[in-house]
Amino acid sequence: MAAMSLLHRASVSAVAALSGRRLGTRLGFGGFLTRDFPKTVAPVRHSGDHGKRLFIIKPSGFYDKRFLKLLRFYILLTGIPVAIGITLINVFIGEAELAEIPEGYVPEHWEYFKHPISRWIARTFFDGPEKNYERTMAILQIEAEKAELRLKELEVRRLMRARGDGPWFHYPTIDKELIDHSPKATPDN
């Protein structure tokens, strides 16, 4: 790069010297060697006098910047309305206050939460503790019945072996004399 810029500068100054000679000189190259070189026509630029800049190959940051911009956009797209909604709920509805339960009234499971958003989440997405308790008790009952049936099956197998009354005595075995072991001429013989 530097050699090309020096060559370019020398050629420009040579052309300027040859084309701009005076009329008084009759020889072809008369004033070329005696005259000063003109000022540089195309200056070499080295980017702020810090030497020659190198072209550093680095990965593109386009996709990273695009991802971060989209991430910021979608976080703000959902974050701003959520923040506004929570603020409005806290200002206009507020937290629940502890009060005496009336006689004969059974509160729902979501009524024990203080904040209205927690109450809505508990009412909409979660089951009540009674339902969870009944579900767990049903699972425990099914597993207990399975364990009891496994124990009964082991006891039945032990008694069948001890008494010799299993299904293996109900089928007569084939007499070995009926099997033909002679060489066959065809597969169907």
Curated annotation (Swiss-Prot):
Residues passing through the membrane, by range: 73-93
Pfam families documented for this protein: NDUF_B5
Gene Ontology cellular-component terms listed: mitochondrial inner membrane; mitochondrion; nucleoplasm; respiratory chain complex I
Transit peptide segment: 1-46
Entry membrane topology: Single-pass membrane protein
InterPro entries, per database record: NADH_UbQ_OxRdtase_B5_su
Location in the cell: Mitochondrion inner membrane
Keywords assigned: Electron transport, Membrane, Mitochondrion, Mitochondrion inner membrane, Respiratory chain, Transit peptide, Transmembrane, Transmembrane helix, Transport
Main function: Accessory subunit of the mitochondrial membrane respiratory chain NADH dehydrogenase (Complex I), that is believed not to be involved in catalysis. Complex I functions in the transfer of electrons from NADH to the respiratory chain. The immediate electron acceptor for the enzyme is believed to be ubiquinone.
Record-stated family: Belongs to the complex I NDUFB5 subunit family.
Assembly: Complex I is composed of 45 different subunits.
Protein name: NADH dehydrogenase [ubiquinone] 1 beta subcomplex subunit 5, mitochondrial
Organism: Bos taurus
Phylogenetic placement of the source organism: Eukaryota, Metazoa, Chordata, Craniata, Vertebrata
Gene: NDUFB5
